[in-house]
Amino acid sequence: KVSDSAYSNSCSNSQSQRSGSSKSRLSGSHSSGSSGYGGKPSTQASSSDMIIKRNKDKSRKKKKNKGAGQGAGQAQTLISASTSLEGRDEEKPRPSGTGCVEQQICRELQDQQHGEDHSEPQATEQLQQEEEDQSGSESEADRVEGVAKSEAAQSFPIPSPLSVTIVPPSMGGCGGVGHAAGLDSGLAKFDKTWEAGPGKLESMTGVGAAAAGTGQRGERVKEDSFCCVISMHDGIVLYTTPSITDVLGYPRDMWLGRSFIDFVHLKDRATFASQITTGIPIAESRGSVPKDAKSTFCVMLRRYRGLKSGGFGVIGRPVSYEPFRLGLTFREAPEEARPDNYMVSNGTNMLLVICATPIKSSYKVPDEILSQKSPKFAIRHTATGIISHVDSAAVSALGYLPQDLIGRSIMDFYHHEDLSVMKETYETVMKKGQTAGASFCSKPYRFLIQNGCYVLLETEWTSFVNPWSRKLEFVVGHHRVFQGPKQCNVFEAAPTCKLKISEEAQSRNTRIKEDIVKRLAETVSRPSDTVKQEVSRRCQALASFMETLMDEVSRADLKEGSGGSGSSGNFTTASNIHMSSVTNTSIAGTGGTGTGTGTGTGTGTGTGTGTGTGTGTGTGTGTGTGTGTGTGTGTGTGTGTGNGTNSCTGTGTTSSSRGGSAAIPPVTLTESLLNK
């Protein structure tokens, strides 16, 4: 009968061990209280041998299942440590007089460790009552080690191997401590023994072995982010950091062997895939990208749903998603992480390292007034009002992911009562667009956020106008939140009910939106003042160029040409009167030295003969009844006697003039242009 009772207890413990739930572990660890023995020692040697053998079998089973989660890994470590203690302290019996105090301390630590387990309150109270009814003198250290270490006369605890698995490293100080004041020293002693044990941790090969070893000792501080490693061959998660439990609630090893994209929201999977496909060619071009270059984007990740207790049943929790900022880094798989019989050429087996950081709402209280130093975010939209770019900094302020806004009309996010203000704002945008790089700040206006509320924005507007077509290309708004929304959590689902607006107001709002889009599609005109300034500047440049061109002609070249015109003058010779048309030329207006050429022809009739001479050539013949002619060049004089007449005409230039000869100064090109 004794053997049957012990066998039934061990069977219940093994079933609880396979179930893995905290409730079964706790119930299995104290099942000895109802076995009929009340925790009293057994005097049969066969029972002792069976206990030792069963505990060793449990240790081997735990070593085989080392990848079952963080709690299982700690249990494996504790079992390995207890095995090492078994060989070291085989002959040392432990005192067993402080079991009640140790049980109370361990109960408190177990309540803290398993405070979030889904066990029912009645089961917990029943467990505590069973622990108080135990009259044992059993040692807590014997339960931690899980083996019998004394002879037949020594007290043995009732076999409960599950008590080893539920004790985390932080609770190790319960074993061997007689009062609560010595708890810290017991913890230090257990840590020291655990580290010195030969079966402390099995070496982990593959990605993330170092990070896996750091999270096993002591109390772990909650982290705000987690990292995971994904194989680019099939998209399977190879490793996750322990902080995934704090961030998303998943057990540490629950993601292993599953596709990462299964945990991404459906609407964000296309964005995730595009980031991967664009990042792979960049990562393959070695040397062109820095080693730590990352691409960041935002997605929604699924949170661990789990189950919650509701009376005697469980109720499924709704699936929820949380926004995260993902940083992607492509790495080549390490050589030692590959199997020995499978070698891959360099560059073909790549790993994707993802660092996920949760995005929190920027607001803490409803209708929060933010300071002037609050961060800004930019939203760019085209001339048709379609959003083309959103900063990732807008996620915490508006609740939208960038891919949620891109492709939508920005007019849908303005409050219907502020559309008239926005129409004036865009009129100013078109006027400022006449000057490149001009910006201005508009009046505050309300903007719709993800949870259905509105925030008050202050915006600095800039625009870009195509210099050739004079068309508006896009408008950029640098926004800053002036007043927060009524609901602080911007990531909550928007209410299904919509704001009721009259048909007249809806038609008016639609008309204003159409007017804004038409205004943005118009050609940006240049101001008249700018045109006048450009024409005046061009005239001045042309006149300056022509003056420079005329200055290149030297005054000496102009002197060789013809000068101003002088007045005609008369002069008288000794015996003849010559009528001469005189032309006087000069540059500076003063008479110069000239050379005159004259030709004279004379005809005389008389009874005598006459001879005319002059400078140059001239001949004259005369008979009494004949005629005489004479020609001459230059300044000539002629005399004749007889009854003949001789006349001479000539033209030439003289060195001086009696007429009024006036010099005309040169006229510049600018003056001539202005005179014309």
Curated annotation (Swiss-Prot):
Domain PAS: from-to ranges: 224-359, 377-483
Q: How is it modified after translation?
A: Phosphorylated with a circadian rhythmicity, probably by the double-time protein (dbt). Phosphorylation could be implicated in the stability of per monomer and in the formation of heterodimer per-tim.
Q: Where is this region: Disordered?
A: 1-161, 583-676
Q: Can you list the GO cellular component terms from the UniProt entry?
A: nucleus; perinuclear region of cytoplasm
Listed InterPro entries: PAS, PAS-like_dom_sf, PAS_fold, Period_circadian_regulator
Q: Where is the composition biased (Low complexity)?
A: 1-34, 644-654
Where composition is biased (Gly residues), the residues are: 589-643
Q: Which coarse location class describes where this protein primarily resides?
A: nucleus
Q: Which UniProt keywords apply?
A: Biological rhythms, Cytoplasm, Nucleus, Phosphoprotein, Repeat
Record motif Nuclear localization signal, residues: 53-66
Q: Which GO terms describe its biological process?
A: circadian regulation of gene expression; entrainment of circadian clock by photoperiod; negative regulation of transcription by RNA polymerase II
Region annotated 28 X 2 AA approximate tandem repeats of G-T, chain positions? 589-645
Gene3D superfamilies the record matches: PAS domain, Single helix bin
The protein's location, in the record's own words, is: Nucleus; Cytoplasm, Perinuclear region
Q: Where is the composition biased (Basic residues)?
A: 53-66
Q: Where are the sequence repeats?
A: 589-590, 592-593, 594-595, 596-597, 598-599, 600-601, 602-603, 604-605, 606-607, 608-609, 610-611, 612-613, 614-615, 616-617, 618-619, 620-621, 622-623, 624-625, 626-627, 628-629, 630-631, 632-633, 634-635, 636-637, 638-639, 640-641, 642-643, 644-645
Q: Which SUPFAM superfamilies match?
A: PYP-like sensor domain (PAS domain)
Q: Any remaining note in the record? A: The sequence shown here is that of clones MA-1, MA-2, MA-4 and MA-5.
Functionally, this protein is described as follows: Essential for biological clock functions. Determines the period length of circadian and ultradian rhythms; an increase in PER dosage leads to shortened circadian rhythms and a decrease leads to lengthened circadian rhythms. Essential for the circadian rhythmicity of locomotor activity, eclosion behavior, and for the rhythmic component of the male courtship song that originates in the thoracic nervous system. The biological cycle depends on the rhythmic formation and nuclear localization of the TIM-PER complex. Light induces the degradation of TIM, which promotes elimination of PER.
What does the record note on quaternary structure? Forms a heterodimer with timeless (TIM); the complex then translocates into the nucleus.
Q: What is this protein called?
A: Period circadian protein
Which gene codes for it? per
